[in-house]
């Protein structure tokens, strides 16, 4: 059946995402790969990586997501237990949590949520970081023991799609278009659009806009002017940007 947008492209400029799928009928796109998910499938996504679920059938969709700020990850890391390094190592890697590990993760996530909801009460901030550390350590220990099972059953994007992504990543601040990208790759615009949509679940132009908006978000945080941001990220028309 024809897939439907489950959401727009996701991108986080300063957060890691731990995603665990529980039920539904979706493909998930991250980095240069996609996977049809089953209960217990999980994914770690680093900051600045585009990712998205893509709904196959109109069924209930349930997942658990934990977002962790990059600075928190660095704070929790030690020379012996460098959580930051391991999350980077497993960026955009799919892995499957067996029932026992999945239930442990869900229990941990409930504790994180409990202390997040009461984080202004005495002790809750410390307990929040403690349970977050426990959850991340459990995940990394599981991955270390099951490295040979990472990215099983994935679909890797063809070179043409990967090259289109790389070209956009390198040139999105310039005056590019789907037509100019197609010319560079020596392929028709319609064929490129079809392939890109099929493998990524999104249009090529949406990918360009997403990259530009990510950079714009960073520059806004740096308190740059809107006009400066508009032209710096590749929008040649101020009205299009706002």
Task: Name each model feature, range by range.
Residues 40, 191-196, 240-241:
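Short hydrophobic/aromatic patch on the recognition helix
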Residues 100-103, 117-134, 155:
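All-alpha amphipathic helical-bundle segments outside canonical DNA-binding/catalytic cores
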Residues 166, 170, 175, 179, ...:
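Terminal helix-turn-helix DNA-binding modules in bacterial transcription factors
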Residues 24, 104-118, 160-171, 215, ...:
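Solvent-exposed, amphipathic alpha-helical segments
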Residues 1-42, 49, 57, 78-85, ...:
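Generic protein-terminus/edge-of-domain signal
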Residues 135, 168, 192:
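Conserved hydrophobic/aromatic pocket- or pore-lining residues that grip, position, or stack substrates
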Residues 1, 47-118, 137-146:
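A hydrophobic/aromatic-rich effector-binding and dimerization subdomain
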Residues 146-151, 198-200:
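Short, Lys/Arg-enriched N-terminal segment that forms or immediately precedes the first helix
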């Amino acid at each position: 059946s024809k897939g439907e947008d489950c959401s727009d492209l996701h991108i986080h400029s300063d957060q890691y995402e731990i995603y665990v799928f529980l039920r539904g009928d979706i493909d998930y796109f991250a980095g240069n790969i996609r996977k049809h998910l089953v209960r217990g499938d999980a994914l770690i996504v680093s900051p600045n990586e585009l990712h998205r679920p893509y709904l196959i059938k109109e069924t209930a969709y349930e997942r658990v997501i934990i977002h962790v700020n990059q600075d928190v990850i660095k704070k929790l890391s030690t020379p012996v237990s460098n959580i930051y390094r391991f999350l980077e190592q497993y960026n955009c890697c799919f892995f499957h949590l067996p029932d026992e590990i999945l239930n442990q993760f869900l229990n941990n996530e409930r504790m994180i949520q409990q202390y997040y909801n009461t984080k202004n009460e005495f002790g809750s901030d410390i307990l929040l970081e403690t349970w977050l550390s426990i959850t991340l350590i459990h995940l990394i220990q599981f991955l270390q023991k099951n490295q040979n099972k990472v990215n099983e059953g994935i679909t890797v994007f063809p070179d043409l799609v990967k090259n289109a992504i790389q070209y956009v990543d390198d040139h999105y601040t310039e005056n590019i278009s789907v037509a100019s990208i197609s010319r560079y790759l020596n392929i028709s615009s319609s064929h490129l659009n079809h392939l890109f949509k099929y493998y990524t679940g999104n249009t090529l132009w949406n990918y360009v806009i997403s990259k530009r908006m990510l950079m714009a978000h960073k520059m806004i945080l740096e308190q740059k002017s809107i006009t400066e941001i508009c032209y710096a990220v590749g929008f040649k028309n101020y009205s299009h940007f706002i």
